[in-house]
């Protein structure tokens, strides 16, 4: 069985389920709190309350350009719909990677099924949680902020896997810690952090996750004591 294709199909179905549910429940116009403000600044390219959300504003403006003026609020709400559905997709991929890494690499049929089941259950449980669903159907920065966070986490885990594979291929040869081809993902992650702060500063918290993953893969050893790690 072509498990790569199966994984792609399941991930696609998870994305479509989330997208369909969010689209069916999206707010037709402005919701409470900051939503009206974000719709206005995106449509008119104006300035929001500090610290601002310039990248969100530009994306919202792009979506509103394909809608009639009376449907601008609905079009900008769709930014959250699409971003949240992509976040659910990335959550599925992250859980699958975590399960496969815990398994030491999925080789048997039951291992693939376990990884897929974990990804589907985890991502859909997250998708239909109250707080996430609430932000997925209105014009708020939190949906696209979560997308950036999930994307950075997934890219960092992908870097970790590819870096380990490259290190194994080197067979113990000396190399510079930044000398792997997989490190292009680190450059992309740094770029995404720059974009993400144009949405919400909360995304910067993912830097600690990236730093720990880099430390564990590059400098940590199984025989290290706690003092040696610090």
Q: What is each PLM-predicted segment?
A:
Residues 1-21, 96-97, 103, 108, ...:
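Start-transfer (signal-anchor) and selected internal transmembrane alpha helices
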Residues 12, 78-108, 151-158:
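Transmembrane-helix motifs of polytopic, lipid-linked glycan transferases
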Residues 42-74, 81-82, 89:
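Short hydrophobic/aromatic helix or loop-helix immediately within or flanking a transmembrane segment
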Residues 107-113, 152-186, 193, 212-229:
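Membrane-interface transmembrane helices that cradle and orient dolichyl/undecaprenyl
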């Amino acid at each position: 069985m072509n498990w790569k294709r199966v994984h792609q199909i399941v991930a696609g179905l998870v994305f479509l389920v989330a997208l369909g549910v969010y689209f069916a429940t999206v707010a037709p116009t402005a919701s409470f709190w900051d939503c009206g403000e974000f719709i206005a600044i995106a449509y008119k390219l104006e300035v929001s309350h500090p610290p601002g959300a310039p990248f969100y504003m530009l994306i919202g403006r792009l979506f509103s350009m394909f809608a009639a003026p009376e449907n601008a609020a609905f079009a900008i709400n769709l930014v959250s719909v699409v971003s949240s559905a992509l976040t659910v997709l990335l959550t599925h991929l992250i859980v699958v990677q975590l399960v496969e890494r815990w398994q030491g690499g999925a080789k048997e049929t039951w291992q693939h099924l376990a990884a897929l089941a974990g990804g589907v259950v985890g991502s859909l449980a997250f998708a239909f949680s109250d707080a996430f669903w609430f932000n997925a159907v209105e014009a708020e920065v939190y949906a696209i902020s979560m997308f950036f966070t999930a994307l950075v986490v997934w890219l960092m885990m992908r870097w970790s896997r590819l870096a380990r594979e490259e290190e194994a291929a080197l067979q113990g040869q000396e190399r510079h810690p930044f000398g792997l081809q997989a490190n292009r993902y680190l450059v992309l992650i740094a770029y995404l952090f720059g974009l993400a702060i144009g949405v919400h500063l909360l995304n910067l918290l993912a830097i600690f996750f990236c730093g720990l993953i880099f430390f564990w893969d590059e400098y940590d050893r199984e025989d290290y004591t706690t003092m040696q790690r610090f």
